[in-house]
Every structure is written in C-alpha cells, then in structure tokens.
Amino acid sequence: MELDTTHISVLLNEAVDGLAITDDGCYIDCTFGRGGHSSVILSKLSDNGRLIAIDRDPTAITAAEKFKDDKRFLIEHQGFAALAEIAEKHELTGKVDGILLDLGVSSPQLDEAERGFSFMKDGPLDMRMDTSKGQTAAEWLAVADVEDITWVLRTFGEEKHAWRIANAIVDTREETPLTRTSQLAKLIKTTAPQREIKKHPATRSFQAIRMYINSELDQIEKALVASLDVLAEGGRLVVISFHSLEDRLVKQFMKKHSQGKKVPRGLPISEIELNKGKKLSLVGRRLKPSQTEVEENVRSRSSVLRVAERLERNTD
C-alpha cells in the first residue's frame, strides 16, 4: 500500500511561532505524523540544532525516512507518554527548548479505511494508533459488558445515548460479531437519534472508542507532567487540541502550574514565596485557526492552540 502523505498540519505557523525557536536549540515534536511541523522546525535550525520526533504509528516512522540523512533529526517509535524516558535516554532532561504536542488523529489515519478510525469508510474495526500491539476496537467490543461500554461512550465521547448504544452493541454481537466500521456506524445510526444535523450520529462513539483503545487522555497527562522536567528554563510547551476533553485537560494543567501558592489574604508573605510552586507562565491567549485555514482544511475547525513557558526552577 502506498503511503499517504497528504496530511495538512493544523495551525502550522502559529505552533512553530509558539516554540520561539532559536537556531541552535533542541526541540521535541511529540506527534511527528507526516512531518509537517518537524519540517518547518528543521528549516529554522542551524547545524547545531537538534530535533527529536516521537510517534507510535508505524506509518509515521516510515514517513520519517525522508529525514534519515539529516544529522540534526531522529525519531523514536513510542507514544508521547514516554517523553520523560526518551529525554533521559538522550541526556536531555531539563535541556529541551521546546515541546510540541499535536493531538488527535491525522488525516492519513482517518482516510485509510484499513486503520478503522473512520465511520465514513468501511474497514476493519481496529482504531489502534500503533498497529503492532494492543487490543483492537473489535476485540474490545466483543468482550466488554454494557456497563463498560456505556462508561467509555459517556466519558470519552460525552454521548447522551451511551446506554442505548451499548445495549445495542451487546445484543447485536450475540448474533453477529462486530468487525467492520460500517457495521458499527450503521448500528449506532439506527439506535441513537441524530443530535446535530451536520454531525453523523456515530461521531462521538467512534471518538470515545478510539480514545479508550489508545489511552489517549492518559498519554496526554503523562506527557504534560513530563514536560515540566524535560523543558529547560524558558522552554516552550505548545499544544494543539481538537476537542473539549483534550483542551480541558491542557487548559487545567497549564492553569494549575502557572499559579503560585494559595494563601489567605493579608498574610505578610513575600512575592518570592507567593510565586513558589509556579512552574509555567502562560503565553498569550488560546489560538483558533483563521477562517482561511478552516476553508482550506475543514478538519482544523475545532483545533485550539495553547502555549506556556517553563519558569526558573528556583520557583518550584
């Protein structure tokens, strides 16, 4: 199968600007994808600069071969939850000038029916980011009980009809195994009323199952926490989210670590003491794609970019 390289990086310039790149700096692209952001980062680095990319999708590792002769670049085939371990392996803990996280599913993953991410194309019900390991969506749906399926649909998809859909899945699999995306999409469409005119009834359920299969929120949380140790003082953390669950997690993390100690009013405490515990400084406001970008790439419409800067460690 020919590798699909048609992915358009969302908020490309805004994300790279947020990194505030210095030509001899060290950066980590936690979601290489097809290398859109990495290409621009490399174009801004001198021979002394360095870029480490991370991706758990085998097709992304293949796509990274275009940089194999660039001594400034290397890629690690892992999930970005391993950020701390990767930085330690390369002796970069506390030395990285910028970390980029571009969350969600890439266009090639959605467009390739065999990956099983899309309800718009028939394919095997897989949904794994890393196809070399782990449980597929079909395998999980074959054994999960109604309560577990309901919890996943509600927690990761905010699906109001979760119980109804979960019951339909369990009832259906007793007669016919659910192994194809088209089967699941049709089942959901006939089970749950359409909530939004422009949104397929299966949208939230597919998102929820994908996020559960890939432990996406857990991966994000681990990477965010690791970034505090991996970043150098003044290093930038840039995160692009694509739905409210991701963005809420990022927003709360950045807010938490950009605030100092909470103390009662009126106490005679110095500014240094008040700032103790602050690890991040928020950089600007959240950014959304321009109307032009949305028109050129409709998948960018829900994206949100947030930036924070690592503070001096004597305030930790």
From Swiss-Prot:
The keyword Lipoprotein does not apply. Gene3D superfamilies: Putative methyltransferase TM0872, insert domain, Vaccinia Virus protein VP39. Pfam families: Methyltransf_5. It catalyses: cytidine(1402) in 16S rRNA + S-adenosyl-L-methionine = N(4)-methylcytidine(1402) in 16S rRNA + S-adenosyl-L-homocysteine + H(+). One of its GO terms (biological process) is rRNA base methylation. S-adenosyl-L-methionine binds at residues 35-37, 55, 80, 102, 109. It comes from the Bacteria. Its EC number is 2.1.1.199. Keywords: Cytoplasm, Methyltransferase, rRNA processing, S-adenosyl-L-methionine, Transferase. One of its GO terms (cellular component) is cytoplasm. It is found in: Cytoplasm. One of its GO terms (molecular function) is rRNA (cytosine-N4-)-methyltransferase activity. The keyword S-adenosyl-L-methionine applies. Belongs to the methyltransferase superfamily. RsmH family. Specifically methylates the N4 position of cytidine in position 1402 (C1402) of 16S rRNA. PANTHER family: 12S RRNA N4-METHYLCYTIDINE METHYLTRANSFERASE (PTHR11265:SF0), S-ADENOSYL-METHYLTRANSFERASE MRAW (PTHR11265). This is Ribosomal RNA small subunit methyltransferase H. It comes from Colwellia psychrerythraea (strain 34H / ATCC BAA-681) (Vibrio psychroerythus).
